From Swiss-Prot:
It comes from Saccharomyces cerevisiae (strain ATCC 204508 / S288c) (Baker's yeast). Disulfide bonds join 303-598, 310-629, 598-620, 598-629, 620-629. Interacts independent of oxidation state in the cytoplasm with the karyopherin PSE1/KAP121 (and less strongly with KAP123). The reduced form of YAP1 interacts in the nucleus with the nuclear export protein CRM1, and in the cytoplasm with YBP1 and the peroxiredoxin HYR1/GPX3/ORP1. Interacts with RBG1. Residues 67-90 are annotated as: Basic motif. Changing residue 78 to A: Dominant negative transcription activator. This is AP-1-like transcription factor YAP1. Residues 303-315 are annotated as: n-CRD.
Length: 650
């Protein structure tokens, strides 16, 4: 500070006074000398403590033990620092990985949302004209992600040429989307206009550009075939769905649906007139349908065979195992042959019994099986009408059988007809009326009315199980005796008084009989009053008496025994009534735990350690015989499954 003050003093001094300047100069020199002296003293004072606390002196004072301790502490501190550093770095690496995964998820979500936004914008265009906001959204998405499937050129092209859709067309499109039918329509116009519709084509759902040709006739044929077989519909739908899902460049099903509607809104003919709108099934275009669930477990061929027991969607009629005898019967039966009709006329068995009846064909085993089916539809199934004739006279029955055999050869003119049970000969009512006319014989009146000898002889055998004496009374008031159908019935007489009353005779007065019945009722009422009074006076025991042996063997009052007997009877009645009602209230116990589905059985078979040694075909056939139908499908008892597995191990 002295130097600076001196310099300032020199600067402040005016140059005019030289004397003062010289005096001040001498004083300045003195001040500088003093300052130098004070500086040298301060330096000496600072050097002295440094010499006292020098490092060489401290190092010489430390012991080797303290040195080792300090080095160990330093190493431990350095080790801890390195561990903390590594731990911190690992935490930071984990954070970086989590942030990277979050970033990837965000990118995937952003890409998905962009695609969804593009899809929504495109769908919105179909219901209303395109606006500027739609084009801005598409341009923004194109700038953000240039790898999208559409480009700016397409967007600019769409902006330069906007879609001009009238409001009427939009409303019609919406109505057509809303009003789909769930059944395939019967299109009768296509049968007449097959040649006209060859050129018209529908877009294919499997083609991403919707330009695959497909004639309308083929489409309608496929739709009609699909109504006959539901499996074909499901398979075709599942195949189309798989192709749509696996094709990266394919559009959604709504795009294909819209193209179908726009293409086939009006199918115009050659004359230029518009026909009706084509009705399409919404099931063909629905993505919510579960194609894998086809009412049966499509696990393997094993389950498809097992499901035949209860029937499937493709084959609703259940199939049962057929024995070898049944197979031979079906192979040789006349049902499978078109030249031998099975049904015959039961009312004119004398003229329309086919050649396959037991009376005519008893040759080989095959014809025996055939006869069991050829008799179906006739009276008595597998029996001729002659078997119903009363067999009191064996010779008469054998003769009639032989005569029918000869008559079959004469009158069997319609055996090869398509409808053998319809007779060409007219039905003669005179034969019936004359045959059942009162007081006449069967053969006499038939000869007068009809001269056909074969019909005359068979008239006895037409209805052999009806007694004409009871069914057709005569005018005679006493009795009627008609010619019977068989010799055993010749002695039967008709009691006229059993069915018809004559008021002129004695004892046939209905009013008198009514009065007599009234008197009998009064007597019975009086008798019941007397019996009730006796019961009250304990002169008659109302309970039934027990055997004397029982009374002697069991001591006690008769009243107690009777009371016990009455109570036991009541209990027995209650038990019987309970047994009658048990059938109504029977509940089959549930065995859900012990019943296995086909998929569970197949899992058990495939996981068996000796799976290669199992006879799967034999096991399947045996389980089909033991299968049961339930709400869940085909189920089999677990014990039966285990026994079958043990049985079919090679």
């Amino acid at each position: 500070m002295s130097v600076s003050t001196a310099k300032r003093s020199l600067d402040v001094v005016s140059p005019g006074s030289l004397a003062e300047f010289e005096g001040s100069k001498s004083r300045h020199d003195e001040i500088e000398n003093e300052h130098r002296r004070t500086g040298t003293r301060d330096g000496e004072d600072s050097e002295q403590p440094k010499k006292k606390g020098s490092k060489t002196s401290k190092k010489q004072d430390l012991d080797p033990e303290t040195k080792q301790k300090r080095t160990a502490q330093n190493r431990a501190a350095q080790r801890a620092f390195r561990e903390r550093k590594e731990r911190k770095m690992k935490e930071l690496e984990k954070k970086v990985q989590s942030l990277e995964s979050i970033q990837q998820q965000n990118e995937v979500e952003a890409t998905f949302l962009r695609d969804q936004l593009i899809t929504l914008v495109n769908e919105l265009k179909k219901y209303r004209p395109e606006t500027r906001n739609d084009s801005k959204v598409l341009e923004y998405l194109a700038r953000r992600d240039p790898n999208l499937h559409f480009s700016k050129n397409n967007v600019n092209h769409s902006n330069s040429e906007p879609i001009d859709t009238p409001n009427d067309d939009i409303q019609e499109n919406v109505k057509q989307k809303m009003n789909f039918t769930f059944q395939y329509p019967l299109d009768n116009d296509n049968d007449n206009d097959n040649s006209k519709n060859v050129g018209k084509q529908l877009p294919s759902p499997n083609d991403p550009s919707h330009s695959a040709p497909m004639p309308i006739n083929q489409t309608q044929k496929k739709l009609s075939d699909a109504t006959d077989s539901s499996s074909a519909t499901l398979d075709s739908l599942s195949n189309s769905n798989d192709v749509l899902n696996n094709t990266p460049n394919s559009s959604t099903s709504m795009d294909w649906l819209d193209n179908v509607i726009y293409t086939n809104r009006f199918v115009s003919g050659d004359d230029g007139s518009n026909s009706k709108t084509k009705n399409l099934d919404s099931n063909m275009f629905s993505n919510d349908f579960n194609f894998e669930n086809q009412f049966d477990e499509q696990v393997s061929e094993f389950c498809s065979k097992m499901n035949q027991v209860c029937g499937t969607r493709q084959c609703p009629i259940p199939k049962k195992p057929i024995s070898a005898l049944d197979k031979e019967v079906f192979a040789s039966s006349s049902i499978l042959s078109s030249n031998s009709p099975a049904l015959t006329n039961t009312w004119e068995s004398h003229s329309n019994i086919t050649d396959n009846t037991p009376a005519n064909v008893i040759a080989t085993d095959a014809t025996k099986y055939e006869n069991s089916f050829s008799g179906f539809g006739r009276l008595g199934f597998d029996m001729s009408a002659n078997h119903y004739v009363v067999n009191d006279n064996s010779t008469g029955s054998t003769d009639s059988t032989g005569s029918t055999g000869n008559k079959n050869k004469k009158n069997n003119n319609n055996s090869d007809d398509v409808l053998p049970f319809i007779s060409e000969s007219p039905f003669d009512m005179n034969q019936v009326t004359n045959f059942f006319s009162p007081g006449s014989t069967g053969i006499g009146n038939n000869a007068a009315s009809n001269t056909n000898p074969s019909l005359l002889q068979s008239s006895k055998e037409d209805i052999p199980f009806i007694n004409a004496n009871l069914a057709f009374p005569d005018d005679n008031s006493t009795n009627i005796q008609l010619q019977p159908f068989s010799e055993s019935q010749s002695q039967n007489k008709f009691d006229y008084d059993m069915f018809f009353r004559d008021s002129s005779k004695e004892g046939n007065n209905l009013f008198g009989e009514f009065l007599e019945d009234d008197d009998d009722d009064k007597k019975a009422a009086n008798m019941s009053d007397d019996e009730s009074s006796l019961i009250k006076n304990q002169l008659i025991n109302e309970e039934p008496e027990l055997p004397k042996q029982y009374l002697q063997s069991v001591p006690g009052n008769e009243s107690e025994i009777s009371q016990k007997n009455g109570s036991s009877l009541q209990n027995a009645d209650k038990i019987n009534n309970g047994n009658d009602n048990d059938n109504d209230n029977d509940v089959v116990p549930s065995k859900e735990g012990s019943l296995l589905r086909c998929s569970e059985i197949w899992d058990r078979i495939t996981t068996h350690p000796k799976y290669s040694d199992i006879d799967v075909d034999g096991l399947c056939s045996e389980l089909m015989a033991k299968a049961k139908c339930s709400e869940r499908g085909v189920v089999i008892n677990a014990e039966d499954v285990q026994l079958a597995l043990n049985k079919h191990m090679n």
